[in-house]
């Protein structure tokens, strides 16, 4: 796989109040090409926006591809890499038999991830990582546009 065939995705979610108005942002980079995506919801949570950012970014890929997806969300990282296998085995229930929170979004993310070969990478939020800062700005733009 050459660099030209490898996508880099940077995602972030934001919420004003939790729950409250929220936004999500994503940057997709393939070779010299970049695409910015963002959106918002009137009543949501930060975790739902983090998940939505990843889902919308992966949905935007036009064909199966390999690459890296960067998130500052431990919830998304642990969910996609560790917890999801048990949830699926348990019929979307947690180990203590409670329904998985945000199961609708986890199921969408799971379906999208299967189409690609993505490595998930955690980055510390608000620590000067340029693309994470841009994704955060896009997420906040999603919130601002709700007011429009």
UniProtKB/Swiss-Prot annotation:
Keywords: Cytoplasm, Endonuclease, Hydrolase, Magnesium, Metal-binding, Nuclease
Substrates-to-products reaction catalysed: Endonucleolytic cleavage to 5'-phosphomonoester
Free-text cofactor note: Binds 1 Mg(2+) ion per subunit. May bind a second metal ion at a regulatory site, or after substrate binding.
Pfam families linked to this entry: RNase_H
Enzyme Commission designation: 3.1.26.4
Stored CDD domains: RNase_HI_prokaryote_like
InterPro entries referenced in this protein's UniProt entry, alphabetically: RNase_H, RNaseH-like_sf, RNaseH_domain, RNaseH_sf, RNaseHI
Gene3D superfamilies: Ribonuclease H-like superfamily/Ribonuclease H
List of residues binding Mg(2+) 2: 12, 136
NCBIfam families: PRK00203.1
Family: Belongs to the RNase H family.
Subunit structure, as described in the record: Monomer.
Name under which the protein is recorded: Ribonuclease H
Recorded name of the encoding gene: rnhA
């Amino acid at each position: 796989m050459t660099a030209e065939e490898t996508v880099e995705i940077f995602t972030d979610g934001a919420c004003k109040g939790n729950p409250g108005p929220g936004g999500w942002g994503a940057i997709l980079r393939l070779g010299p090409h970049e695409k910015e995506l963002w959106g918002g919801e009137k009543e949501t949570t930060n975790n739902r926006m983090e998940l939505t950012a990843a889902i919308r970014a992966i949905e935007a890929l036009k064909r199966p591809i390999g690459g890296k997806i960067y998130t500052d969300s431990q919830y998304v990282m642990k969910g996609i890499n560790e917890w999801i296998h048990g949830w699926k085995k348990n019929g979307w229930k947690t180990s203590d038999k409670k329904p998985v929170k945000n199961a609708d979004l986890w199921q969408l993310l799971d379906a999208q991830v299967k189409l690609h070969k993505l490595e998930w990478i955690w980055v510390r939020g608000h620590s000067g990582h340029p693309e994470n800062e841009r994704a955060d700005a896009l997420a906040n733009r999603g919130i601002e546009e709700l007011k429009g």
